[in-house]
Amino acid sequence: MAKQKFERTKPHVNVGTIGHVDHGKTTLTAAITLILSKAGLAQAKGYDEIDKAPEEKARGITINTTHVEYETAKRHYAHVDCPGHADYVKNMITGAAQMDGAILVVSAADGPMPQTREHILLARQVGVPYIVVFLNKADMVDDPELIELVEMEVRDLLNQYEFPGDDTPIVVGSALKALECGCGKRECQWCGKIWELMDVVDEYIPTPERDIDKPFLMPVEDVFTITGRGTVATGRVERGKVKVGDEVEIIGLTTESRKTVVTGVEMFRKTLDEAQAGDNIGVLLRGIQRDEVERGQVLAKPGTIKPHTKFEAQVYVLTKEEGGRHTPFFNGYRPQFYFRTTDVTGTIQLPEGVEMVMPGDHVTLRVELITPIAMEEGLKFAIREGGRTVGAGVVSAIIE
């Protein structure tokens, strides 16, 4: 079959497999690529190819991840699969692989296991909005009542973490049997289940809103004055669009936020009608003095984001080998928190009953910053000590 030209006409969605070790995440990933390849919608990737995931660095942390791509009649997908449990934790906390939806793989023979629970919790905390379930290894279970029991357990678990467990689509099948058969026909007992799963992913996980359609936000990286014209803030537009005449708010580092109007937008020293997500720009701000805007603040559409000092976070603490701490930290630990473009000192409060946090741990903690930062749930940050990264985190809830 001639290799098809990749066309960017279909909407794009990021997904990934999550679930307990050895429940079949990688086998399922291989099966999806094989079955879809029969319809010319993917390149088949073998288990071994996916399993030997290359190392990547995200925010100074080494993560092993495999990316595969495939499409259905409706959409184009990028799919991540991680070999080890620690890789999932790091991936989800750093946002190295932002998922619009996840395929939770649970062995019908074993039912939910500790990492099943931890991955659902992580998905909830880091903002993976949708989960669909593949009950794998159905060929190893003779009693249909057992499968129903596992299905009920999974729905319960999803409900516990505020996912709509009762309405979550669950597909029962066997990734291994589909791989072994490989006929790719919809009417096949095993291959058909992979098609059913892809239909569910197509229908149940919505196409995400594009960054460009979200409200404007730009982290300020630098500020300078243009004589006779005023103050310019530079940075990369994180989301939305901005044009001359737009009202923007300067937020962060103080409790007061100020509104101003954009009087000029420049990119590569040329004026621009409108800048959008991904552009590196300079924004000329009306009536703003050089000292009234600084690195670490953000420019945003008024009313869309607020400054906060107290929040709850999911944090991964780097190991010594990753360049992190060699020793644990305790309640009251005061490192720097690096948000977007700047470091802010903060104090850590550990959960009740947690004495200390060891390098390599994944923990929920509370933080109080000494100055407010423009913040919302899902915002990523690094924890630093003397300029080196010792942890990675994501804001899971705002306290005040």
Curated annotation (Swiss-Prot):
Gene: tufA
Residues annotated as domain tr-type G: 10-209
Species this chain originates from: Caldanaerobacter subterraneus subsp. tengcongensis (strain DSM 15242 / JCM 11007 / NBRC 100824 / MB4) (Thermoanaerobacter tengcongensis)
Superkingdom of source: Bacteria
Enzyme class: hydrolase
Record localization: Cytoplasm
Family: Belongs to the TRAFAC class translation factor GTPase superfamily. Classic translation factor GTPase family. EF-Tu/EF-1A subfamily.
Lineage summary: Bacteria, Bacillati, Bacillota, Clostridia, Thermoanaerobacterales
Subunit-level organization: Monomer.
InterPro entries: EF-Tu_GTP-bd, EF-Tu_GTPase, EFTu-like_2, EFTU_2, G_TR_CS, P-loop_NTPase, Small_GTP-bd, T_Tr_GTP-bd_dom
Binding annotation for GTP: 19-26, 81-85, 136-139
EC number: 3.6.5.3
Annotated spans, G5: 174-176
GO cellular component term, pick one: cytosol
Keywords assigned: Cytoplasm, Elongation factor, GTP-binding, Hydrolase, Magnesium, Metal-binding, Nucleotide-binding, Protein biosynthesis
Reaction it catalyzes: GTP + H2O = GDP + phosphate + H(+)
Annotated region described as G3, given as residue ranges: 81-84
An example molecular function term from Gene Ontology annotations: GTP binding
Chain positions covered by the region annotation G4: 136-139
Protein name stated in the entry: Elongation factor Tu-A
Main localization of the protein described in the UniProt heading: cytoplasm
Region described as G1: 19-26
Function description: GTP hydrolase that promotes the GTP-dependent binding of aminoacyl-tRNA to the A-site of ribosomes during protein biosynthesis.
